[in-house]
Design a protein with these regions (language model features):
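Phosphate/pyrophosphate-binding loops and the adjoining catalytic core of nucleotide-dependent enzymes
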Residues: 1-15, 19
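Short, surface-exposed acidic
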Residues: 35-39, 172-176, 255-265
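Active-site acidic catalytic loop and adjacent metal/ATP-binding pocket
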Residues: 45-53, 57, 181-231
């Protein structure tokens, strides 16, 4: 039904092969009483995700067991937490591949919803996102020591990897020179308490319904780290320099806009584990790293 495991070069075509995935998904649906006629694949995501009208099945390739462990840990941790997140319905294995069944949240991803929103609606949505971030950050982190990455540890991980990561993600010599200058001039970051962070709140992981936040999805990258880190992905992929939305995001998060905070947020926008600087600069129409960062977080 499924291969025992798949290296990355074999997984990519398998991820696109809907018919190869179908027998496993139908078996899971039958096991948990989901209507097989409603099963349909999702195109987004690293893992294999299918859904019915009310539920979502997420099938984890055994190649990355850490993703599975974190996602399941977070789904269990967030049950009853009062956050707009999928609720865990079942978990198991099929042919050695772990999976979860969870509730399906309503709404569209941000790239589909944002262009249809006026300035007031965007401001409300950004405030909703910030408030949900604050709610997540307020949850206890007891028992999550394995996910701990305090600010200095995270910086120690990210700084040496920046140039190589961005080269692999489409950066050229000109960008590498700018990134090296960025590293050479990296200022002290605002001290930040370690809290529970989703860590990948890009536009694809935020759902919108009727102009308001419907929920956060995909917690496989979550960890316990500096609260400032959480704002980086959302600033790059959602508010994208829109001043009203930016202010609303910070207001919803319950933090004051200070020069020190803005400097820190610019730094995390570059140093984020999943930052694609060349792509983001190109989309924003900037050849200069510094001008792009200035538009992300205006004073």
């Amino acid at each position: 039904m499924l291969p025992a495991t798949l290296p990355l070069d074999a997984y990519r075509p398998f991820r696109r092969d809907v018919e190869a995935q179908r027998p496993a998904m139908e078996a899971i649906a039958a096991r948990h009483g989901l209507p097989p006629g409603e099963l349909a694949p999702f195109s987004q995501g690293t893992q294999i995700v299918w859904g019915t009208q009310r539920s979502v099945i997420k099938l984890f390739v055994p190649t990355w067991p850490e993703d599975t462990r974190i996602e399941m840990l977070m789904l269990e941790r967030l049950v009853g937490a009062g956050l707009p997140v999928p609720q865990l319905e079942a978990r198991g294995e099929v042919a050695g591949w772990p999976y979860v069944v969870m509730s399906r949240l309503p709404g569209q991803r941000v790239p589909e919803a944002w262009p249809e929103l006026d300035a007031d609606a965007r401001e409300r949505l950004a405030h909703d996102i910030g408030a949900a971030m604050a709610h997540l950050a307020a949850l206890p982190v007891t028992g999550l020591d394995a996910l701990l990455a305090p600010q200095e540890s995270l910086l120690g991980e990210r700084r040496p990897r920046l140039l190589q990561d961005q080269r692999e993600r489409g950066g050229d010599d000109a960008l590498e020179a700018q990134l090296q200058a960025f590293l050479d001039a990296l200022p002290p970051l605002l001290p930040a308490e370690s809290v529970l962070v989703h860590a990948d709140l890009t536009a694809d992981n935020i759902l919108v319904h009727d102009g308001r936040l419907a929920g956060f999805i995909d917690f496989a990258d979550a960890f316990v780290g500096p609260w400032t880190y959480e704002l980086a992905a959302t600033s790059c992929f959602v508010t994208q320099g829109d001043r009203r939305s930016q202010r609303a995001l910070l207001s919803g998060r319950g933090v004051e806009t200070t020069p020190e905070l803005l400097v820190t947020l610019r730094c995390w926008a570059v140093l984020h584990r999943y930052s694609h600087v060349a792509t983001m600069m190109q989309r924003a129409g900037h050849a200069s790293l510094w001008s792009w960062l200035d538009t992300l977080w205006l004073p």
